[in-house]
């Protein structure tokens, strides 16, 4: 009996020892050497000491390894603007020691090719005879491994960890591991602009990040475990792949412990043991766990996750002895489709998403820790978002875990934008590679409840529709835990008939370049949306892309791998054009317009029936493709000054009050009519909601104009009612707003309004007699009927020169007349994406910066930025270029040029010319003033100011310089390349 007890104790200690140390951390200093000539394998570098060292985890750029960046550096990514390489103005940035690129962030070091990493590791004695795996969480991107001089194999996933079974290669005691990482694009070409590899965002780096470990298991182990929740019967089907390489059948069991700890809903746990016999080889074991009706469900409002511990056990002398353990997370949730909408646990939801582009300048790669991703998702949630699409890449495990915790619906993608030199469906190696990557993604991340949607990549070319159709069909039949689309595409791409849902452009944007702003229209009747079947949700692809001027204060934040030397160039250009001090003002003014556009595009989507959601491009800035500053946060997800999350939340959250207004400008005798709606996608209907409508003015007057009590269902376009407000006597120009709120909640929204008085034609100097000009001192002018008005003309004619010479006042209304500035095409809407990537496609401006403290604007209420009342004056209006004006000169209404050129341009200025005073504008303040309320008021404001004692222009400008505005022509912009992005090509895939 004593011998038996000793034997049993020894056996149990042996089993316990298997779990004492199950992994060895390989982080630390590794030997390192660049293999520039690709000779390392033939020269057996895996078997010798390397000549440098580098810490892992880490990347070569992060550790300042590689080549200095020069003008000859070959980047991974498309360029459609070659001015940097040919323009004399860019020559100083091509000089070694001062290398700066305008197209994307600039790393200190760059290297593409193989590099070697080597180290020794000592195995514990109790690892002898066990299965041992080398785990590399995120190499970039092809890894080849040697152990003790013997080649183990190669892996090249861009999405999941590389795991090498090194059992046959290790020995007792010291072992040598050599890893060759190669980041070249070879036979497998994801596309140079794929965010998995491109220098446009993260950079095509060489290295290994995340966890680096040797992991030990027994020879009976869990190779895969997938959990499939079913809400109909509150069960979870667990598919466990058990591998038995022990050489004999093993009788035992699988022990399951699932536990959810919810702060709001308590704790729920399930413990079940299922008995099995594990024959030699690989087997899939399917067990069903009864979670019960006490199951705690997961969604964006209650992101409660179950932690499942699964242990494979062997029956030993009547007891279960643990052999291998797997810990995973899953959510009791179902993400499905109901008609045109997505459903979470049977309740409709609307995706309010952003596109994440692997843009992390400090490291140059996606964060590998959960805390960093949790910060990103919580910031996005503070802006009312609930969804993220990962553009042509798949994030690491930490991102899914953080999204599970925060409650975010994710669409990771295969690591490919198979275009611009690559293709899909043409029989190239990328076809099989992406198919395998999807399998790997589902295996690695499939249990995460946040993994709700999947696509293979972005905007392919080739015979891709047939390929993605097979892809979607396969996954629909294979794994119903999420929904599938083939690829996320622009409006010009072919339709994907087999996709369960569609991420496609076409039904997006604002048409304010063609008609005046309103909040009436929506995307009903859109031809793109009409293509989708009755059970196929439609999500807008890359919504927004409205630009904002760079924030040069941001430059100091780039303390890591990638530096904002593009911003330094843009700052220099602004300074060279005599506007160094205006950078922050331009950022703020253009940002206000950007936020206005995002608000109205999002609301337009919310006003559209059967619209499943939108994906912004993006909440944060995009640092590449010419520097696409499209975010209301910087690239680091820090808020910009012109709008904060609370303000954004008014028009972008689960419950948004909406008002359909045909216009935003009113005058005496008009009637303000508004249809009130609610888009509500909260966790439950709102019963007996008190909905209040206020009309507010800038003078703190607040009048209730509507009150409704309604039960608000979950869904879009819920009609609340209408309000109608007669606009009585308007005595002065005034700004106001319409406010709609749901009492007792934080759901409130507002729309800007402008009220202008009726203006008598006599005050506008519309007749020839009135516009002849007042008598200047010493002149022979005798017109005494209208002595107050300046001389009004549309050019600097001889009479204007004579009046100015004699000390008189002149107003030039030069709409459509100037040539110097004609090269700049202005619209009310700002630059889309950026002018470099789209080869100077108009518009070229990002709004206006107004000297709103100037006395002229006493009669024309305005902020320092453009708002919807400016549309009538600004849209398609010519600008004047002030390059030749005196240093320090600034117009009263300054158009904000594309930051690649930053010409000093504008639409309204004053100056002393000769002995007189000149006011000149290219805004149309002449035509159809009986219908153009804003233009009429602007004309009156200008005239009133010119006739006031405050008309004292600061700068003196030669008459010849003013005359040049009508004769001089600026040189055309040469991009020095014939290539163009897909959207500018006549035929799109």
Residue ranges of predicted features:
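Catalytic beta-strand/loop cores that center a nucleophilic Ser/Cys/Thr
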Residues: 819, 836-933, 950-989
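Substrate-binding/catalytic cleft of secreted carbohydrate-active enzymes
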Residues: 377-378, 387-633
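Short alpha-beta junction capping motif
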Residues: 787-834, 915, 921, 942, ...
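N-terminal carbohydrate-binding accessory modules
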Residues: 309-380
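Accessory carbohydrate-binding/adhesion or oligomerization-edge regions at the termini
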Residues: 20-98, 180, 184-186, 942, ...
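Beta-strand-rich binding/interaction modules
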Residues: 145-147, 235-277, 285-287, 670-711, ...
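Accessory beta-strand-rich segments of carbohydrate-active enzymes
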Residues: 33-37, 66-67, 77, 83-97, ...
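Extended acidic/polar, glycine-enriched regions
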Residues: 170-174, 241-336, 729-761
């Amino acid at each position: 009996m004593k011998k038996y007890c000793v034997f049993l104790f020894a056996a149990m200690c042996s089993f316990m020892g298997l779990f004492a140390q199950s992994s060895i951390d390989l982080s630390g200093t590794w030997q390192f050497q660049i293999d520039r000539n690709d000779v390392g394998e033939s020269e057996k570098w895996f078997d010798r000491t390397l000549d440098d060292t580098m810490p892992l985890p880490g990347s070569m750029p992060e550790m300042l390894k590689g080549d200095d960046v020069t003008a000859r550096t070959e980047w991974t990514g498309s360029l459609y603007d070659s001015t940097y390489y040919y323009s004399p103005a860019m020559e100083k940035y091509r000089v070694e020691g001062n290398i700066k690129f305008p197209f994307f962030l600039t790393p200190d070091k760059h290297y593409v090719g193989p590099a070697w990493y080597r180290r020794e590791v000592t195995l514990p004695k109790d690892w002898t005879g066990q299965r041992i795996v080398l785990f590399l969480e995120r190499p970039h991107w092809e890894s080849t491994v040697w152990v003790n001089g013997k080649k183990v194999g190669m892996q090249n996933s861009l999405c999941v960890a590389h795991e090498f079974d090194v059992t046959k290669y290790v020995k007792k005691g010291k072992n040598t591991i050599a890893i060759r990482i190669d980041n070249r694009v070879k036979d497998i070409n994801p596309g140079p602009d794929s965010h998995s590899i491109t220098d446009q965002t993260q950079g095509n780096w060489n290295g290994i990040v995340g966890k680096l470990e040797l992991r030990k298991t027994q020879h009976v182990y869990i190779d895969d475990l997938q959990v499939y929740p079913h809400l109909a019967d509150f069960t979870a089907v667990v598919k466990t792949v058990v591998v038995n390489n022990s050489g004999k059948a093993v009788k035992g069991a699988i022990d399951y412990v699932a536990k959810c700890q919810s702060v709001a809903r308590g704790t729920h746990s399930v413990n079940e043991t299922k008995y099995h016999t594990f024959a030699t080889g690989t087997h899939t074991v399917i067990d069903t766990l009864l979670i019960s009706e006490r199951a705690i469900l997961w969604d964006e409002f209650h992101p409660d996750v179950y932690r499942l511990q699964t242990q494979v056990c062997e029956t030993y002398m009547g007891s279960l002895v643990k052999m291998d353990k797997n810990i995973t997370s899953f959510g009791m949730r179902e993400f499905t489709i109901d008609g045109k909408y997505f459903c979470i646990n049977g309740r409709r939801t609307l995706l309010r998403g952003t596109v994440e582009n692997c843009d992390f300048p400090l490291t140059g790669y996606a964060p590998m820790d959960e805390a960093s991703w949790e910060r990103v998702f919580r910031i996005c949630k503070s802006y009312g978002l609930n969804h993220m699409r990962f553009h042509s890449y798949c994030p690491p495990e930490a991102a899914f875990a953080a999204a599970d915790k925060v409650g975010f619906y994710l669409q990771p993608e295969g690591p490919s934008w198979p275009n611009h030199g690559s293709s899909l469906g043409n029989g190239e190696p990328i076809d099989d590679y992406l198919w395998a990557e999807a399998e790997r993604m589902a295996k690695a991340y499939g249990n995460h409840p946040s993994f709700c949607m999947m696509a293979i990549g972005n905007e392919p070319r080739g015979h891709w529709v047939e390929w993605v159709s097979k892809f979607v069909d396969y996954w629909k039949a294979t794994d119903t835990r999420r929904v599938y689309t083939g690829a996320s595409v622009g409006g010009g791409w072919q339709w994907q008939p087999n996709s369960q849902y569609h991420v496609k452009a076409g039904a997006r944007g604002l048409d304010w370049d063609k008609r005046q702003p309103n909040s009436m229209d929506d995307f009903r009747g859109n031809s793109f949306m009409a293509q989708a079947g009755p059970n196929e949700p439609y999500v807008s692809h890359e919504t927004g892309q409205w630009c904002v001027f760079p924030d040069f204060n941001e430059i100091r934040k780039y303390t890591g791998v990638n530096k904002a030397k593009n911003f330094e160039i843009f700052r220099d250009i602004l300074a060279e054009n005599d506007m160094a001090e205006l950078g922050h003002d331009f950022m703020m003014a253009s940002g206000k317009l950007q936020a206005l556009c995002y608000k109205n595009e999002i609301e337009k989507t919310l006003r559209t029936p059967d619209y499943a959601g939108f994906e912004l491009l993006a909440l944060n800035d995009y640092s590449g493709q010419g520097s696409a500053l499209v975010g209301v946060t910087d690239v680091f997800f820090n808020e910009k000054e012109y709008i904060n999350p609370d303000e954004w939340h008014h028009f972008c959250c689960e419950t948004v009050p909406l008002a359909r207004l045909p216009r935003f400008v009113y005058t005496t005798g008009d009637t303000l009519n508004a249809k009130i709606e609610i888009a509500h996608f909260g966790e439950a209907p709102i019963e007996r909601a008190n909905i209040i409508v206020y009309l507010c003015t800038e003078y703190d007057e607040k009048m209730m104009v509507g009150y409704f009590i309604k039960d608000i269902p979950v869904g879009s376009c819920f009609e609340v009612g209408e309000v109608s407000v007669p606009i009585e006597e308007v005595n002065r120009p005034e700004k106001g707003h319409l406010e709609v709120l749901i009492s007792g909640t934080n759901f409130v929204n507002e729309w800007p309004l402008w009220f202008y008085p009726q203006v008598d034609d006599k005050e506008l100097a519309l007749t020839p007699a009135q516009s002849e000009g007042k008598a200047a001192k010493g002149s022979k002018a005798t017109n005494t009927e209208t002595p107050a008005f300046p001389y009004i003309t549309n050019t600097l004619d001889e009479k204007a020169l004579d009046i100015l010479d004699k000390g008189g006042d002149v107003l030039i209304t030069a709409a459509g007349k100037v040539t110097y500035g004609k090269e700049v095409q202005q619209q009310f809407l700002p630059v889309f994406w950026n002018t470099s990537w789209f080869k100077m496609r108009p518009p070229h401006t990002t709004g206006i910066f107004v000297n709103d403290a100037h006395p002229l604007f006493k009669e024309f209420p305005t902020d320092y930025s453009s708002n919807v009342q400016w549309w009538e004056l600004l849209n398609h209006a010519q600008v004047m270029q002030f390059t030749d004006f005196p240093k320090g000169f600034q117009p009263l209404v300054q158009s904000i040029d594309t930051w690649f050129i930053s010409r000093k341009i504008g639409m309204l200025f004053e100056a002393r010319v000769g002995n007189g005073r000149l006011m000149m504008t290219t805004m149309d303040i002449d035509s159809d003033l009986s219908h153009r309320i804003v233009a009429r008021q602007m004309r009156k404001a200008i005239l009133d100011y010119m006739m006031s004692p405050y008309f004292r222009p600061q700068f003196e400008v030669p008459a010849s310089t003013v005359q040049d505005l009508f004769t001089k022509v600026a040189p055309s912009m040469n991009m020095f390349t014939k290539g163009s992005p897909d959207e500018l090509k006549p035929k799109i895939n």
